[in-house]
A protein has these predicted regions:
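Short, surface-exposed loop/turn segments at secondary-structure junctions
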Residues: 48-51, 78-86
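FKBP-type peptidyl-prolyl cis-trans isomerase
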Residues: 35, 61-68, 170-189
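Post-signal-peptide N-terminal segment of Sec-exported extracytoplasmic proteins
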Residues: 20-57, 62
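Bacterial Sec-dependent N-terminal signal peptides
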Residues: 1-25, 190
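Aromatic/histidine-rich interaction motifs
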Residues: 81-166
Length: 190
């Protein structure tokens, strides 16, 4: 028999934070410090801090630092030279347009989106991002032990023909919801 106790109860994750989206992003430099710099460069701090009267609540499909770094290192000119070595090198309007394509004009939790029709690129919820980009956001159930639709539920986004996976959904703040995009996502305009 085993005498060692290798189980460590780390508790339940708390998806609710008593702060603004802007303040929340500052609590996790590992994932969000580059995102913060892009928001500042785009002049969108008030939007993320809940101080924009035209849009007091938001949903943010958040590109993490890794997503932004991939964009910077993979965006090259005709001579294969990296175009953006620092966030300050990215044009302000590009930062603004890319960020706004990740923002919805209201709070939406995972449960607020419809399911995708399995095996199709249809179903889900169609909604316009603040950039004007039409998004299809959908829930999908995976299989478990060979049985369809009883496994983990995920959240995904389609914009035109590109599809992206949400890494962590339903992080709620006072003025918004953050759905953190997976580390495989490369920051772009959706």
């Amino acid at each position: 028999a085993c005498d060692d106790d290798y189980f460590h109860d780390s508790g339940l994750a708390n998806g609710r934070h008593d702060c603004t989206v802007w303040e929340y992003l500052h609590t996790d430099a590992y994932n969000w410090d580059s995102t913060i710099l892009v928001i500042e460069r785009a002049g969108l701090v008030d939007l993320f801090d809940g101080k924009d009267p035209a849009c007091p609540e938001i949903t943010f499909f958040g590109p993490t630092n890794i997503s932004i770094m991939q964009f910077m290192y993979k965006t090259v000119d005709n001579d294969d030279k990296v175009m953006y070595e620092r966030i300050e090198d990215i044009p302000v309007e590009m930062c603004r347009k890319m960020l706004l394509s990740h923002v919805l004009p209201k709070k939406m939790m995972k449960k607020d989106f419809d399911y995708e029709n399995r095996g199709t690129l249809e179903g889900g919820t169609y909604i316009q991002a603040l950039s004007g980009t039409e998004l299809r956001v959908f829930r999908a159930k995976s299989s478990y032990m060979g049985i369809a639709d009883i496994g983990a539920e995920s959240l995904g986004i389609h914009a035109l023909v590109n599809g992206y996976i949400v890494g962590i959904a339903d992080i709620e703040m006072n003025n918004g919801i953050v759905h953190s995009l997976s580390y495989t996502y490369q920051f772009s305009e959706l």
